[in-house]
């Protein structure tokens, strides 16, 4: 069974927004409407629009916005629209399908590098389940690359050791499909936590588009010169409360892809004692299930340094971890210091670092561990 609720209304006024997104007030609706101008076109007060209210009406979805699906009525004349930039379609066979110039197409400046890609050459690839983990993973890498005391000696991002390292975020299509929906991406780029974003599969809106996760990883290394990569979905995981019915299983698929292409797969653990749901307390059942049934490639699951009772609880939960995997422990605290210095405040289910510190420590620890792999003689592709 399927169902979508679409209503027609008018834009009453333009509200705030962020790059690639415009928020609008809508007549008769109590939530803002979210507009992707790259998909819908520009909107103005008074425009008649079709609005998809399905997720917001159900109380679902990160952000709580209605989505403006189309501008209706007579459009302004302005000659023929510009031709699409490429030939690959994302959001395929939906009314919102868009054409992209992907890195695999011959017209793309990265096409040759991807065609000649010979492997990831041992770079670490950190796979995270949730979008909210990405800033701490990135900060863990940057803090470790910069060395001890970097936030107090000129500030993160100014140290040559971290400026020379390239970190690429690969956003999959397991969550939000539009990279523009994420405010964290813009904040991470502005703070020099990440150098570029590649959107793969049906996801779109990154600095580079790729058809598959594998070609996205190839582009990260061969075209963008990644010293490390982070793979995670965009905002908004799909979950059902069942063992296999959650889109975070894609984390294991990312570990498999990294291993198959010659990278070093590193898994960020999902750990929390603030989540009210029992299945996510301690080590989340998502992490346990993913490492068992989805991550078939030998991978390293990284844990943060924790007080002894909590560490013992985590290790007990991991007693049944398949033998193909290994567990490592790293310090996630420098990552959180780095985020604080840069003014980046990620949250998970409304909980910030001060509310759910182990969750973010675990993500930072994965980044710190991955940076150690870079230190073991890895060099940039560029």
Region spans (language model):
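Residue-level signal for short, function-critical loop segments
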Residues: 55, 173-174, 271
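A short N-terminal beta->alpha junction/helix N-cap motif
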Residues: 33-40, 125, 172-176, 351-354
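Phosphate-binding glycine-rich loops and their immediate beta-loop-alpha structural context
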Residues: 99-149, 159-210
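N-terminal amphipathic/hydrophobic targeting modules at extreme N-termini
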Residues: 154-157
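Extended, charged alpha/beta regions that create polyanion-binding interfaces
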Residues: 2-122, 145-146, 161-168
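Non-transmembrane, aqueous-exposed alpha-helical and coiled segments at domain scale
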Residues: 2-27, 144-145, 164, 168-169, ...
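Flexible, glycine-rich phosphate/dinucleotide-binding loops
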Residues: 58, 176, 274
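Long, contiguous hydrophobic alpha-helical segments, chiefly transmembrane helices and signal peptides
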Residues: 36, 46-51, 55-56, 60, ...
């Amino acid at each position: 069974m399927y169902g979508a609720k679409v209503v027609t209304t008018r834009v009453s006024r333009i509200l705030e927004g962020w790059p690639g997104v415009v928020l609008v007030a809508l007549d008769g609706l109590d939530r803002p409407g979210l507009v992707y101008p790259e998909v819908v076109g520009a909107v103005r007060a008074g425009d008649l629009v079709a609005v998809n209210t399905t997720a917001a009406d159900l109380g679902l979805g990160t952000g709580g916005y209605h989505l403006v699906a189309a501008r209706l009525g007579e459009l302004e004349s302005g000659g023929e629209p510009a031709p699409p930039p490429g030939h690959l379609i994302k959001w395929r066979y939906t009314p919102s399908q868009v054409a992209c110039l992907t890195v695999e197409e011959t017209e793309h400046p990265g096409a040759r590098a991807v065609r000649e890609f010979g492997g990831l050459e041992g770079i670490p690839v950190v796979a995270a389940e949730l979008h909210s983990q990405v800033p701490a993973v990135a900060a863990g890498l940057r803090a470790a690359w910069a060395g001890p005391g970097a936030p107090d000696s000129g500030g993160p991002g100014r140290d040559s050791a971290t400026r020379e390292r390239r970190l690429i975020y690969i956003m999959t299509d397991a969550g939000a499909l539009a990279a523009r929906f994420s405010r964290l991406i813009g904040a991470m780029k502005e703070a020099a936590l990440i150098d570029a974003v590649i959107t793969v599969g049906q996801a779109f809106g990154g600095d580079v588009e790729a058809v598959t996760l594998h070609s996205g990883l190839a582009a990260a290394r061969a075209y963008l010169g990644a010293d490390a990569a982070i793979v995670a979905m965009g905002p908004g995981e799909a979950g059902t409360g069942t063992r296999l019915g959650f889109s975070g299983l894609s984390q294991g698929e990312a570990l498999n892809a990294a291993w198959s292409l010659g990278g070093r797969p590193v898994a960020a653990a999902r750990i929390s004692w603030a989540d009210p749901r029992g299945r996510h307390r301690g080590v989340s059942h998502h992490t346990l299930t993913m490492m068992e049934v989805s991550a078939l490639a030998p991978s390293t699951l990284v844990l943060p340094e924790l007080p002894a009772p909590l560490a013992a609880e985590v290790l007990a939960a991991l007693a049944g971890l398949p033998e193909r995997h290994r567990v490592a422990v790293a310090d996630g605290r420098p990552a959180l210091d780095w985020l604080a210095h840069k003014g980046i405040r990620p949250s998970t289910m409304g909980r910030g670092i001060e509310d759910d510190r182990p969750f973010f420590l675990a993500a930072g620890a994965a980044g710190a561990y991955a940076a150690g792999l870079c230190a073991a003689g890895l060099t940039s592709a560029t």
